[in-house]
Amino acid sequence: MSEASTQKGHPKGLYLLFTTEMWERFSYYGMRALFTLYLTKALLFDKALASAIYGDYTGLVYLTPLIGGFVADRYWGNRKSIIVGGVLMAIGQLLMFTSGMFYTTPSSATAIMLLGLLALIVGNGFFKPNISTMVGQLYPQGDKRIDAAFTIFYMGINLGAFIAPLACGAVGDTGDPADFKWGFLAACIGMILSLIIFISMKNKYIVTPDGSPIGGVPEKVVPTIEEKAASDKVGNGRAYMWLGVLVTLYVIFKGVVGFDIIGSFIFACTVAAPGYIITDPSLDKIERSRIWVIYIIAFFVIAFWAAFEQAGASLTFFAEEQTDRNLFGWFDIPASAFQSVNPILIVALAPLFAMLWVRLGKKNQEPASPMKQSIGLFMVAVGYVIIALVVKDLGPGVKVSMVWLFSLYAIHTMGELCLSPIGLSMVVKLAPVRYSSLLMGVWFLSTALANKVAGDLSGYYPEDVHKKSAYGAPKFEANFNGLDSTVVIDANTKFFASNAKPSMWTVATTADNKKEAPEKTGMDKFMHNMTADPLVDYFTAAEETDVVTSVAIQTSVTPKIEEHKLKQITPKGEKTKFSIGVSEDANTAYVLKMTPDEINKEKMNVAFEVWDLNPKKPSIFGQEIKNLYEFFVVFIILAGVASVLLFFLSKTLLKMMHGLR
């Protein structure tokens, strides 16, 4: 038995890649579990904007493997790409930690966060396709152990994904926005561990069955002068043609269809990159046929991941706001912890599914890859059927049992086991060796598009309240009853937290978004009589710091804010001091928040927010999404239709695989 083999017949290199990927996925899923919560609870973005950023980030995370795969196949090799990618991702997580330190100054925190996301996106592009490709390279071509190897590798991914939300959520998702940074730091440590393990052991274990190193700089074949001239003419012409297609499609998607910049680029790449590969004249008939199978199934996989990846966006909002997370009256489970349900079930169920496929294979009844993936899509649709029925007649402010969310994740997990590891194995089996990493990148490209779509669809999540605008207030003045003079309260004092309720406020603000700021001439429209409830005081905001408006508090009785809406405006666990005013028509709330500065504890950061208490419901294809039931039906239709279509195409795709399954 060679140094690189185990008694169970798998190379030891598989378990090194298992551990490396486990810690990298710990880093990714730990940050992802906190990301939308960080955006909405710390940086105070609304759900639509947070969902859009989430979709852009996860979409680009799966787009850049296309570039990373190309660089590895042509220039760097797998090993160098993995190391470079890991270093960039560690830097990205460190920047996320830094962003969390400055969350009380949203402009600085957002800028640092965007740099962190950029590093994570580029780093993932080099890391992800290359480590998956190396798993297949550990085995001889046609080895029957490859499917089992990818199942084991997939368990490593999900073991990291299980631990991450629990560990990062325990220190980051505490209800206090100041703690998000510790979750990001934990994710950074996970990435550093992944790098240390891979770099220290790669030379010993990442080898072929005959002991040759895997993943080095690719050998350059030196062609004859005639071959080089012919190749350059065809290759360069083809590259320029598809680059032109990429640019043209981008312009169409951006200028005509109206997609955003990132969405337009992802959609354009989804057409141009596969087109570049399939038009390679060196491909023979069988190779081209098998590549078409990858493309067709990848198209249907978009529907799967667009529905499945709601876990990090709309289903996180659902866990936070609509799920009773109290466990036996002892404590509330963090919303981020629910993202551990899927990976732990993967770890538990993956061996059972592997045994099922083996048993069916012995009876000559094992479904081919396209059929398995059709089943996976069907299971996702079933999961949404269950949760949709549960929320159909849900009253305002009523929360559902966490059992139903667990049920959805359990069914989705079974669907994932029918689709995702089978897809990775299928790409390795069907891809020509010279295009192995690049086609793995194309496979992830479908996931990129799916994640972008997932973020956009999450933006249709119906909200009870919607934050219209937010402003930073460097200081405000309060005129108290019984005082002859105006007391000026600067943002570096704790006066507000310890003194009596003001009867008159003058608030000087700076607008983060000038387009959303109230017009100077329209200040009167905010001057409504307010309820005398002790919680509610009235105040207003000016567009610029030199515009000051004073409004006396009135005591006439007007509608109060419903409790379930109030909880969304003033989240439990925040150290912020709140004063809230509601307009006479009960459609708008004005919130003044004072939060201790994270760096200088003696300083108070002041923010002013305007909330729509009865926001307009979103609509998709002209159909208004009035409630959660209608929102979840969207995913039932998306996954269900894709499942049926792929089912009927399965036999045709099997023939196109030319003997492979």
Indicate residue ranges for each PLM-predicted region.
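Central cavity-lining transmembrane alpha-helices of secondary-active solute carriers
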Residues: G55-V71, S340-F353
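A membrane-interface helix-boundary motif in multi-pass transporters
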Residues: G172-I189, G255-I261, A368-M371, Y460-G482, ...
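Conserved MFS/SLC helix-loop-helix module at the cytosolic interface between two early adjacent transmembrane helices
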Residues: I67-V87
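C-terminal ends and interior cores of transmembrane alpha-helices
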Residues: V87-S107, F378-P396
